[in-house]
């Protein structure tokens, strides 16, 4: 009934109450505090958000809606009306519950985020404030005695008023424990899920002069639940005073912005990192054979200046680009606390030729390698010619062998023997040493008429050093003065005991000229090879040694190779010393081309990129890249060794050379036909010098004389020596134009004699003193315009005008000079002999007395010789 009356109430235009405009915002004044005690009153206002109250949670409204629906919908039965009413009520309740649940979840999420941010900011602000307060307290403690009382007094009311500040609004997390917790009205109990949310009052910062009834009026019978507010400390609450700093009141501290806190935190972190030593990282530093200081510093991640300081402490004065050895670098790395690992550039040679030992099942017999050694002109090459039925000795310049040759001979029984012929001249010691190193048996050729000679003894030493057996061939048995017994007896002095004297050394009396007992020599060699049981594996990569190397026009660099293991084929890639190449052709000792070379077979190999050195190892590798790496490493190693040899000496040595005078040098450019001759020439010429003059080899190589050789000789004013080679037309024309001397030779001792004569001509001549006579002073005369003249008697020898004289007084030399005048009876004479009187005067000297003795002598110039 009540609802019906409300709907039927008469309408009226008169308002029920007085119209008024409510305030949309609350205003107030706050005082802002700044640094240095400044403050300012500002006007602020807080606007309240307008929210429309939800009707979903009001039970009365729901009932009215249901009744209204029942009034207008008269076509439904009471049961249907009750069911619809229940459905509407349930839907409204579910919607309210869902909305409330979402709202609570959103509020809880925001509360957690705000709480976390607030706690973080408060913690940072508290820590920074404590640090600032402590610093300020320490600073203020020293000035407290000087601070006027009136400056400290105003701070007391401010500190005292701090506890009267209004308490902060409660957070969404619930009531905070405090003195006003019990005074909260009971209306703040949790609302039911169906209750509509009420807008909470906004927190308003009011002036201290505002009246308290204003706050009370805002509270109603049912005070609304306060809206959650972000609890953040105000950025500026007041300036820091001495009293507040000493009491440690946190409320008097002035807050800082988040950005300022972040910057301060980063600054403190950087300061702590600078003050605390950083944790050192231990690195593994790879150290090669040589390394410069900058590279070492980079690998350790250290400054180059620190590395140089460490080197200076170790006594090594080095620059940033100077190279140091591996041992010094390892000490530096250990000084910095890092770990070092030594590596070497020679690692590229690892595994080169170091194959596994060949099994006995793959080994086959091979011919013996025999080296013929002995003194010069004892018939080594003639003996080989007789066995090969050739005439090599007839083509040798000067009748001596100056090359090392390798040949293979087939005996009557069909067996093969490889012979290596070595020079016997003293200059070819290196060749003989190479021959003994690669050989299996040494045939020592001794002339029956000469016996044991110096190079024979040297050959015996090479054979003993190589630990190879010796077969003695006593040659020239066709001569009438041959004495083989003397040879056998002389061999005993060098620990070679032949079979005739109870030893185990085989010896054969032969004659190369008449081909006497050559078959017995072959039998002795084969017997010795059977005892040695020489075998090799032919089915593997080839290994050998360079016997000789040369440069031929149209063929390039050619080397004679003695194969020791494996089989060498055309197309193989190889490394020989510092050079590499690919086999283009193989030529045997008869000049025939072959496709393969088996063990103990000497062949000429074409295809070198450069000329190798005699005695270098010859090894076949798997590919071209490996060959290039090994070749580049060995060339770099040779260059470094050359730089070490030509490096400047110490400062003391330089001063010694300046004081003693630099030794005169004869620059020489040597070009020869084969590498062995180059070595022999260099060794022979370098032995010719002495302390006054010496040979300086500018360049020594294999091949013809070209323009670059002439240019090099011109730059040093040197001499060019061509041994069995000639200069090309362009080089000859350039040498003629520039005045460069080119000497051609084919015999090595002729080169030595000529160079020795040149060095002798560079020596300073020596002077020899020759005594010629004595004269005694009998009287002294004073002659006007002449001075004092001595009247003398020649007591011994003769006296010559212009000769050197010494004036002796009491057997002490008081003057040394020369005669200016020599007269006899007023006539100038050239000489006065013993027993005659004469008059003499000295050049620029007049202190002569009666009784003095004049010694007369001459200086003879003597040419110096080496």
Swiss-Prot record:
Keywords, in A-Z order: Cytoplasm, GTP-binding, Initiation factor, Nucleotide-binding, Protein biosynthesis
Region annotated G5, chain positions: 511-513
Biased composition (Basic and acidic residues): 92-135
Transmembrane segments: none
Region entry Disordered, spans: 1-63, 92-257
Record carries keyword GTP-binding: yes
Region spans: G3: 421-424
Polar residues bias locations: 26-36
Domain tr-type G: start-end pairs: 365-533
Binding residues for GTP: 374-381, 421-425, 475-478
Cited function: One of the essential components for the initiation of protein synthesis. Protects formylmethionyl-tRNA from spontaneous hydrolysis and promotes its binding to the 30S ribosomal subunits. Also involved in the hydrolysis of GTP during the formation of the 70S ribosomal complex.
Domain of life assignment: Bacteria
Region (G4): 475-478
SUPFAM superfamilies membership: Initiation factor IF2/eIF5b, domain 3, P-loop containing nucleoside triphosphate hydrolases, Translation proteins
Organism: Rhodospirillum rubrum (strain ATCC 11170 / ATH 1.1.1 / DSM 467 / LMG 4362 / NCIMB 8255 / S1)
Protein name: Translation initiation factor IF-2
């Amino acid at each position: 009934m009540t609802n019906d009356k409300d709907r039927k109430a008469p309408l009226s235009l008169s308002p029920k109450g007085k119209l008024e405009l409510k305030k949309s915002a609350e205003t107030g004044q706050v005082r802002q505090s700044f640094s240095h005690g400044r403050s300012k009153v500002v006007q602020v206002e807080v606007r309240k958000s307008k929210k429309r109250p939800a009707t979903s949670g009001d039970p009365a409204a729901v009932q009215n809606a249901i009744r209204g629906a029942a009034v207008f919908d008269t076509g439904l039965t009471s049961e249907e009306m009750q069911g619809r009413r229940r459905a509407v009520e349930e839907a409204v309740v579910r919607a309210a519950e869902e909305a409330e649940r979402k709202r609570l979840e959103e509020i809880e999420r925001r509360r957690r985020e705000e709480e976390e941010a607030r706690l973080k900011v408060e913690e940072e602000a508290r820590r920074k404030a404590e640090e600032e307060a402590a610093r300020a307290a320490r600073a203020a403690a020293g000035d407290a005695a000087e601070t006027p009382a009136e400056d400290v007094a105003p701070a007391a009311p401010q500190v005292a008023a701090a506890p009267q500040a209004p308490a902060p609004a409660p957070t969404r997390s619930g009531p905070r424990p405090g003195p006003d917790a019990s005074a909260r009205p009971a209306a703040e109990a949790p609302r039911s899920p169906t209750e509509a949310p009420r807008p909470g009052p906004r927190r308003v910062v009011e002036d201290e002069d505002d009246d308290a009834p204003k706050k009370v009026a805002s509270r109603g019978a049912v005070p609304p639940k306060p809206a959650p507010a972000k609890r953040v400390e105000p950025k500026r609450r007041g300036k820091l005073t001495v009293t507040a700093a000493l009491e440690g009141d946190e409320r008097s501290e002035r807050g800082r912005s988040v950005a300022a806190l972040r910057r301060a935190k980063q600054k403190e972190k950087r300061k702590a990192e600078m003050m605390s030593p950083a944790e050192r990282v231990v690195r593994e530093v790879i150290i090669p054979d040589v390394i410069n200081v900058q590279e070492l510093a980079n690998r350790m991640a250290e400054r180059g200046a620190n590395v140089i300081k460490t080197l200076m402490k170790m006594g090594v004065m080095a620059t940033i680009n100077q190279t140091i050895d591996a041992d010094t670098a390892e000490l530096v790395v250990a000084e910095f606390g890092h770990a070092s690992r030594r590596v070497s550039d020679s690692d590229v040679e690892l595994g080169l030729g170091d194959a596994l030992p060949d099994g006995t099942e793959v080994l086959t017999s091979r011919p013996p390698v025999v080296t013929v050694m002995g003194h010069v002109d004892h018939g080594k090459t003639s003996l080989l010619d007789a066995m090969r039925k050739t005439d090599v000795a007839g083509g040798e310049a000067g009748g001596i062998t100056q090359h090392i040759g390798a040949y293979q001979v087939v005996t009557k029984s069909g067996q093969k023997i490889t012979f290596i012929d070595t020079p016997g001249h003293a200059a070819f010691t290196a060749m003989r040493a190479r021959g003994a190193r690669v050989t299996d048996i040494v045939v020592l050729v001794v002339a029956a008429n000469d016996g044991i000679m110096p190079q024979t003894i040297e050959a015996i030493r090479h054979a003993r050093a190589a630990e190879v057996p010796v077969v003695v061939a006593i040659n020239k048995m066709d001569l009438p003065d041959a004495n083989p017994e003397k040879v056998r007896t002389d061999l005993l002095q060098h620990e070679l005991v032949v079979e005739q004297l109870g030893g185990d050394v085989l010896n054969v009396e032969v004659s190369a000229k008449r081909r006497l007992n050559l078959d017995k020599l072959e039998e002795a060699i084969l017997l010795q090879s059977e005892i040695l049981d020489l075998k090799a594996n032919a089915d593997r990569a080839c290994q050998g040694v360079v016997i000789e190397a040369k440069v031929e026009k149209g063929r390039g660099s050619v080397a004679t190779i003695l194969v020791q293991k494996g089989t060498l084929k055309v197309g193989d890639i190889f490394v020989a010393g510092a050079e590499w190449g690919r086999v283009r052709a193989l030529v045997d000792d008869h000049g025939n081309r072959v496709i393969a070379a088996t063990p103990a077979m000497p062949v000429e190999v074409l295809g070198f990129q450069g000329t190798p050195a005699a005695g270098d190892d010859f090894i076949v590798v798997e590919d071209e890249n490996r060959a290039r790496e090994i070749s580049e490493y060995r060339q770099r190693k040779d260059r470094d060794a050359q730089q070490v040899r030509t490096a400047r000496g110490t400062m003391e040595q330089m001063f010694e050379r300046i004081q003693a005078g630099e030794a005169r040098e004869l620059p020489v450019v040597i070009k020869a036909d084969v590498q062995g001759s180059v070595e022999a020439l260099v060794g022979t010429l370098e032995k010719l010098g002495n302390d006054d003059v010496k040979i300086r080899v500018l360049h020594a190589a294999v091949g013809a004389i070209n323009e670059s050789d002439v240019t090099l000789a011109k730059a040093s004013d040197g001499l060019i020596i061509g041994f069995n080679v000639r200069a090309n037309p362009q080089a000859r024309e350039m040498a003629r134009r520039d005045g460069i001397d080119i000497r051609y030779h084919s015999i090595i001792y002729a080169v030595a004699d000529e160079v020795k004569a040149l060095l002798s001509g560079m020596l300073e001549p020596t002077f020899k003193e020759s005594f010629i006579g004595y004269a005694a002073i009998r009287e002294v005369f004073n002659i006007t315009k002449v001075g004092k003249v001595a009247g003398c008697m020649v007591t011994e020898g003769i006296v010559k005008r212009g000769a050197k004289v010494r004036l002796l007084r009491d057997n002490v030399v008081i003057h040394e000079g020369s005669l200016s005048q020599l007269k006899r009876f007023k006539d100038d004479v050239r000489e006065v002999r013993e027993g005659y009187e004469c008059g003499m005067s000295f050049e620029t000297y007049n202190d002569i007395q009666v009784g003095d003795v004049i010694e007369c002598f001459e200086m003879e110039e003597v040419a110096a010789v080496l």
